């Protein structure tokens, strides 16, 4: 679901293919000009969403949200929850989260929220309308979860220009190869290290195998940092840098694995809120 100022688009995605697509006038800027105040806006939103539901049919998979208004809602949700990993891409929400954030906005007010969160005035003023659209969308389509995408039309246009062989590459591994070439002391050694340790990880699932490979490629990219802070720098590199193809848990898992490349025991209290998002088994495996 891609929302702009004057429109909102829905597209069905399955097995890498785009299916049904539809556009609507459900943009926050368009709705703000509807006559009849909040009641008129609510009726307009409800009618358009009902039409969209009929045309798109039942959908119960993941809902991907694209667009600045959705990201603003997600940023406020992060703030409300005290969520420690401030990475927008792949941030997950539930319908309960959306409802709580709507109440949070009503109780605290936009001025107070704006003073505490870095969101432009133009963007945050549209949030109350955008969140009503989102709540109505979720009530009708009932997705099993909601994911924020920090990508948009620009990235989609770039992807369209890529040959298939490039599209098929793993974005995480490609990012790590680039980081190694740019920052490591011995570019290329990461793959040798991976080959050397691979027998230890013979039976791990593919999702973990790619994290092992990524950790090998990134094992030395923070060598320039002061030795006293090198472990934390490794963790920050994985959790805050522009790596694609990673869930939030996978970011933290990778960061923790890299942290322990330099330190047996972690004693950085500021990292614990993020690390606590992992299960005990995941922490142990990363270490």
Question: Residues of each region from the PLM?
Answer:
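Helical "lid/coupling" subdomains associated with nucleotide-phosphate turnover
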Residues: 12-287
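Glycine-rich, histidine-containing beta strand-loop boundary motifs that form or position
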Residues: 2-3, 150
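Short glycine/serine/threonine-rich phosphate/pyrophosphate-binding segments
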Residues: 3-9
């Amino acid at each position: 679901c891609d929302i702009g100022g004057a429109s909102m688009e829905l597209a069905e995605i399955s097995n890498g293919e785009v299916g049904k697509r539809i556009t609507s006038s459900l943009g926050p800027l368009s709705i703000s000009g509807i006559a009849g105040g909040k009641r008129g806006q609510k009726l307009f939103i409800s009618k358009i969403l009902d039409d969209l539901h009929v045309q798109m049919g039942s959908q119960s998979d993941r809902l991907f949200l694209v667009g600045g208004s959705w990201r603003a809602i997600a940023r406020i949700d992060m703030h409300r929850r005290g969520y420690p990993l401030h990475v927008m891409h792949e941030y997950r929400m539930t319908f309960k989260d959306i409802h709580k954030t709507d109440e949070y906005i009503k109780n605290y007010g936009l001025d107070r929220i704006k003073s505490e969160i870095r969101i432009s005035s133009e963007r945050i003023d549209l949030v109350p309308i955008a969140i009503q659209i989102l709540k109505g969308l979720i009530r009708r389509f009932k997705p099993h979860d909601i994911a924020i995408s920090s990508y948009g039309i620009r990235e989609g246009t770039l992807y369209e220009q890529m040959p298939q062989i490039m599209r098929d590459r793993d974005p995480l591994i490609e990012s790590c190869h680039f980081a190694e070439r740019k920052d490591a002391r011995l570019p290329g050694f990461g793959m040798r290290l991976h080959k050397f340790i691979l027998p230890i990880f013979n039976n791990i699932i593919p999702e973990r195998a790619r994290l092992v490979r990524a950790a090998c490629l990134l094992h030395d990219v923070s060598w320039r940092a002061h030795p006293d802070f090198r472990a934390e720098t490794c963790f920050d590199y994985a959790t805050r840098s522009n790596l694609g193809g990673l869930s939030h848990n996978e970011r933290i898992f990778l960061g923790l694995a890299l942290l322990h490349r330099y330190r047996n025991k972690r004693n950085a209290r500021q990292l614990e809120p993020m690390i606590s998002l992992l299960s005990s088994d995941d922490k142990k495996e990363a270490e």
